[in-house]
């Protein structure tokens, strides 16, 4: 008899009677949900009713129970509204964080300057013309539909239509790429597909969390496969001190930092850490139990904040305000595994709650008057002196001027910048690999790593903030060796290969403030012209004229890096 035959016979012998007998042994069965928030429906959140939305809902009786019949068009209306509001308004706790940084006597000048700029940017974005950030993100929807909520079953389609409307009819950027084969890609042209996670729950209401997640902060979500050895105060603190530095500044601090210890699987850990960064689990209990419930740990949240403040990284250019706040959540785990998740919500901090009930559609009330958070502090107390840099001169003259100042110096750029990011760099390298020279425009002006949102009528530019510098690190030495990219401008820290290349070739990396894309478009960018690869959309090469464009010298021509100590 084969092993397979033996297995089959064994399976036949296990009948319903055996299962019933086994179940009887578990007389003390106890079900306990892992997540037990005290405010699961976010009643502490202020919601505003969408005017006239009651016409999209109807109560019906089914088998003696009250069900909610929802016209699926309500999903389209809600998604459109959510992904419009979230690009122009912020939660109050986020705005309060910037205000604290401005008023804190322990904050650095750079902390206060960055926080003030971000608050001013919020004021411009609140005009509902320019989005707060040029990277208007991947659209993510978490939906929990009650078992007695009927929509017709095509929820993903109707939610996607609302997202499509938001990105089509507002000044938002299309960032999603479709894979044509393993290597060829194209922009989808509408920012779809969205990520839609829809769940069934008891009741008749339909609850939502809408998130617009940009690439910078999404790329700072980390999974670490640890062991029981991590679970003691000394080891955990050392782990936090090490890993917080790896977040760097590329995702635009001050951050909302989330740390999750444990998880029944890696994917559970990472989903929890993303939602924690959105403050979705704020009402979890603060103690665990023998059944494995999730809980927040306020003591370790304080420790994470202490480590963040003492790191010296600050709000991008040194200081205290690396983070607004922290969330630390402990989960159950398999005895052989200890997954740990680390993630952030960045300065764009775009998430918004909503729900549909028998009265209509309700959406979280974000703050529409951010100007009230700007303190009455003279500008002289908010920033250090800036150095004016005229970019209309030959690039060698600009390099000579920058060489006179130490890293950390704030500069104001005036003149021409060339804008090129990931795909443009890849195409230029491909041209060079095929024997073509480095384009002349890469040699005559600083290179700004960015990609604009759509330009509103009457504006010179759409929101146009920097993208993460690190993704272009591999090109710097090559391009500088061919006489180009001597001065680059973007956000975040860079690798040692960039520092080495700048020292070798006499180059500089200037750090732009990550986050205030609207204020740059309104106040600093005066003209935008497409130079090359127009078919790439926002990934094309652009020529822009700027006035008083703020930046900091991060890497100089002597091999100095302003982050060398804080991120070491």
Swiss-Prot record:
Its main location: cytoplasm. (S)-malate 2 binds at residues 219-225. Binds 1 [4Fe-4S] cluster per subunit. Specifically and competitively inhibited by 2-thiomalate, which coordinates with the catalytic [4Fe-4S] cluster. Weakly inhibited by malonate. Its cofactor is [4Fe-4S] cluster. GO terms for cellular component: ciliary plasm; cytoplasm; cytosol; glycosome. It catalyses: (S)-malate = fumarate + H2O. (S)-malate 1 binds at residues 134-135, 173, 216, 421, 467-471, 491. Homodimer. Belongs to the class-I fumarase family. This is Fumarate hydratase 2. It comes from Leishmania major. The gene is FH2.
């Amino acid at each position: 008899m084969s092993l397979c035959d033996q297995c089959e016979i064994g399976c036949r012998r296990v009948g319903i009677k055996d299962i019933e007998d086994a179940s009887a042994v578990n007389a003390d069965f106890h079900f306990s949900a892992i997540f037990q928030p005290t405010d699961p429906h976010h009643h502490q959140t202020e919601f505003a009713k969408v005017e006239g939305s009651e016409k999209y809902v109807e109560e019906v009786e089914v088998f003696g129970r009250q069900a909610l019949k929802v016209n699926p068009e309500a999903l389209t209306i809600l998604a459109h509204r959510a992904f419009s509001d979230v690009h122009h308004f912020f939660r109050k706790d986020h705005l309060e964080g910037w205000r604290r940084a401005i008023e804190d006597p322990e904050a650095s000048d750079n902390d206060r300057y960055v926080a003030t700029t971000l608050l001013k940017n919020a004021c411009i974005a609140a005009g509902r013309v320019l989005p707060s950030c040029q990277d208007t993100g991947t659209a993510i929807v978490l939906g929990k539909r009650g078992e007695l909520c009927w929509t017709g079953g095509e929820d993903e389609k109707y939610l996607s239509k609302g997202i499509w409307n938001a990105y089509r009819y507002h000044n938002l950027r299309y960032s999603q790429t479709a894979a044509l084969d393993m290597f060829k890609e194209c922009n989808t042209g509408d920012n779809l597909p969205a990520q839609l996670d829809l769940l069934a729950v008891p009741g008749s209401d339909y609850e939502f969390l809408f998130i617009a997640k940009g690439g910078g902060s999404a790329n700072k979500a980390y999974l670490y496969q640890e062991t029981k050895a991590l679970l003691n105060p000394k080891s955990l603190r050392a782990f936090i001190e090490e890993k917080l530095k790896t977040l760097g500044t590329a995702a635009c601090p001050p951050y909302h930092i989330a740390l999750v210890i444990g998880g029944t699987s890696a994917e559970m850990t990472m989903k929890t850490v993303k939602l924690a960064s959105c403050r979705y689990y704020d009402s979890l209990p603060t103690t665990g139990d023998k059944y494995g419930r999730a809980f927040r740990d306020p003591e370790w949240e304080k420790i994470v904040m202490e480590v963040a403040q003492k790191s010296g990284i600050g709000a991008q250019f040194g200081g205290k305000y690396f983070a607004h706040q922290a969330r630390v959540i402990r989960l159950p785990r398999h005895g052989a595994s200890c997954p740990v998740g680390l993630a952030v919500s960045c300065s764009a901090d775009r998430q918004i709650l909503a729900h549909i009930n028998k009265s209509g559609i309700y959406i979280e009330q974000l703050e529409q008057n951010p100007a009230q958070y700007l303190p009455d502090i003279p500008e002289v107390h908010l920033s250090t002196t800036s150095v004016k840099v005229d970019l209309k001169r030959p690039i060698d003259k600009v390099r000579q001027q920058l060489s006179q100042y130490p890293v950390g110096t704030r500069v104001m750029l005036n003149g021409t910048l060339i804008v090129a990011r990931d795909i443009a760099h890849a195409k230029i390298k491909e041209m060079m690999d095929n024997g073509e020279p480095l384009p002349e425009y890469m040699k005559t002006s600083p290179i700004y790593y960015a990609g604009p949102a759509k330009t509103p009528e009457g504006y010179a530019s759409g929101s146009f903030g920097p993208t993460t510098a690190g993704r272009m690190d591999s090109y710097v030495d090559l391009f500088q060796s061919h006489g180009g990219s001597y001065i680059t401008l973007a956000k975040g820290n860079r690798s040692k290969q960039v520092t080495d290349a700048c020292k070798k070739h006499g180059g500089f990396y200037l750090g732009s403030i990550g986050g205030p894309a609207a204020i740059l478009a309104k106040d600093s960018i005066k003209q935008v012209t497409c130079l090359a690869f127009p078919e790439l959309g926002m990934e094309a090469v652009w020529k822009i004229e700027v006035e008083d464009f703020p930046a900091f010298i991060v890497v100089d021509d002597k091999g100095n890096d302003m982050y060398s100590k804080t991120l070491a």
